[in-house]
Amino acid sequence: MSFYNHKEIEPKWQGYWAEHHTFKTGTDASKPKFYALDMFPYPSGAGLHVGHPEGYTATDILSRYKRAQGYNVLHPMGWDAFGLPAEQYAMDTGNDPAEFTAENIANFKRQINALGFSYDWDREVNTTDPNYYKWTQWIFTKLYEKGLAYEAEVPVNWVEELGTAIANEEVLPDGTSERGGYPVVRKPMRQWMLKITAYAERLLNDLDELDWSESIKDMQRNWIGKSTGANVTFKVKGTDKEFTVFTTRPDTLFGATFTVLAPEHELVDAITSTEQAEAVADYKHQASLKSDLARTDLAKEKTGVWTGAYAINPVNGKEIPIWIADYVLASYGTGAVMAVPAHDQRDWEFAKQFDLPIVEVLEGGNVEEAAYTEDGLHVNSDFLDGLNKEDAIAKIVACLEEKGCGQEKVTYRLRDWLFSRQRYWGEPIPIIHWEDGTSTAVPESELPLVLPVTKDIRPSGTGESPLANLTDWLEVTREDGVKGRRETNTMPQWAGSSWYYLRYIDPHNTEKLADEDLLKQWLPVDIYVGGAEHAVLHLLYARFWHKFLYDLGVVPTKEPFQKLFNQGMILGTSYRDHRGALVATDKVEKRDGSFFHVETGEELEQAPAKMSKSLKNVVNPDDVVEQYGADTLRVYEMFMGPLDASIAWSEEGLEGSRKFLDRVYRLITSKEIIAENNGALDKVYNETVKAVTEQIESLKFNTAIAQLMVFVNAANKEDKLYVDYAKGFIQLIAPFAPHLAEELWQTVAATGESISYVAWPTWDESKLVEDEIEIVVQIKGKVRAKLMVAKDLSREELQEIALADEKVKVEIDGKEIVKVISVPNKLVNIVVK
């Protein structure tokens, strides 16, 4: 057979690996460890798409490489299986979300195994398994005991169509929900919160210790949003009331000409005048219909209403109006701002809109035309006049502190984590509310608090989850006869994914989350590969929980993931019409190398776009494996380009990768394998071992494959192939194309055992030395010839060779040689006249 028969070979080796537990995690304490982690998937009904295997193949290459290098490798897989999609599907179809999820997991697992990934399935976790979420609930009870889980009446992002509140991070820029694209409104509700803000400074500072891309670290820094400034207290004229604003520029207080409160601010109703009451009430209602993102959009028209009240500027005693406006959020800072329109563009636009005063306090701009937002010396600022920014801030803060109306303050943009969901399909929150007004956590001995089975899973719409309908489960009685109700909210999908990497380390432990010695052995995760879309949410939450567990003494490291790598996106093929609108692939036909709209006949432009059901350009890996084989898919996705680049899917590229594997198969099965080394491939073989090793280490898989191709080309030019080089090459390609490598290994090594633990090949540095080198020959400073010569020739030998060259002879014929300058290994310069 002259080609790689993937339909026979791939199932054969997948069966072998499963039967022999080839990838069971090593436990030899004398070996170094390597923990390669994938972001575990949500098992959707659609199954895997070709984007999933890109990251999975990368960690699989590293895992196979490290096993061959003698490491104990932990390379697990599991399922992030709670969450809205399964519940939504169950409501739409009448199916049980647990059954639907189990079917999806079985399909995902089948697809993953068909791709030849070397996971240790003995460590599989599933966030919906009570034996798993027992420990999710345990972590929650510890947070509760430490005061880091608490209940609060807060304005939440309510999604009527989903029947639940969602976190700020789950609201899209257009004000709709990330899940489903439904409208989001603000609504006050009793919610469980996690005090992630208590860890803000540590979450910020410890980023410096991580091997993550700066772009991801910056996204987290910006989300945490540390600001240094001052709290300033404003008294409300004619009342005993006051409010505090946080500002990073207290030095501009003399330019504050009005203040703005969030519509939800607790003072609004108390200070609003009778004349303004109706307008304020209407505005508050309108603001409640908008998401935070929609309210804070810089481009939107400025809206607001005067309350009828005035504040007293603490530095000059001036009365300034108090407005409400939706761009101020009750959940951010103090829910109040001092407006300095001369030096803040949003305040300037607001002042212009409502004809409010603009007072310049920093020189350098024309504040009638626009806000001046650069630094400048202070003016119109009494005792601050003539000072720069730093000196003025120090002086004004000292003044405020002396007067008792302000103080230096550090704040964070980060808000506490909204942790409850009004849905069924999630981990029950292990809290009981007693009729005497107290609440207690469910004791550890009673965990897991199992999610009860019910067909009635539609949200109540009242703010309570469907669990509120299950009386037998809901109502409990204490030993002393006091009655109570279980918490009916469930945890968000982020809960189970915030610690799953710890459970992989000891997945069957019934006594604790994981054994301390095993956690010491395996943490931190050596490399974590997944999409950049999780930069803020999942990664920030996981870091928070990890730091909390570190404080409890459960985990031995401050950070969970030492190295993070975000793979790029695999784009689908799509088509655009003359208006730039995307056209679904089933509406396109190809004629004479061009693409046309089936219905209109318009010629279309081919363009890459994100794979989507609507464009009908999603590529199913099952189809690729059937036609080309898993190894082809693996090699193609790694050869497409740099791992972090977003690149369009190409059928031609897939065919090219398949042809390469066929060439590899023919090279090993057709070439005469010899026991004696004739030296012909010494240099290219050792170059290949070195390059592939170094490029796997640096995740440059595309260039590693390119070097493997160089070797195949060189080897095909020879009649015979040295057996050790054949073996070494098969080992080098094994992480990329493991099924093919296993099969070829048996043809040259015939051990009957897997290649997986055969020691990784090494290179001989002496074989990399160039025997020949190119020199240039110059005549009167101009290059006239380039010659290949033996390395390290003397000046005299170089001169002799250069003068004997036919081209050089022609150039110097009939001329007098004045001088010859020779530089070994570089050049010969002949001076003539």
UniProtKB/Swiss-Prot annotation:
BP GO terms, sorted: leucyl-tRNA aminoacylation
Top-level taxon in the UniProt lineage: Bacteria
Catalyses which reaction(s): tRNA(Leu) + L-leucine + ATP = L-leucyl-tRNA(Leu) + AMP + diphosphate
Subcellular location: Cytoplasm
Chain positions of motif 'KMSKS' region: 610-614
Chain segments annotated as coiled-coil in the UniProt record: none
UniProt-recorded name of the protein: Leucine--tRNA ligase
Annotated organism of origin: Streptococcus pneumoniae (strain P1031)
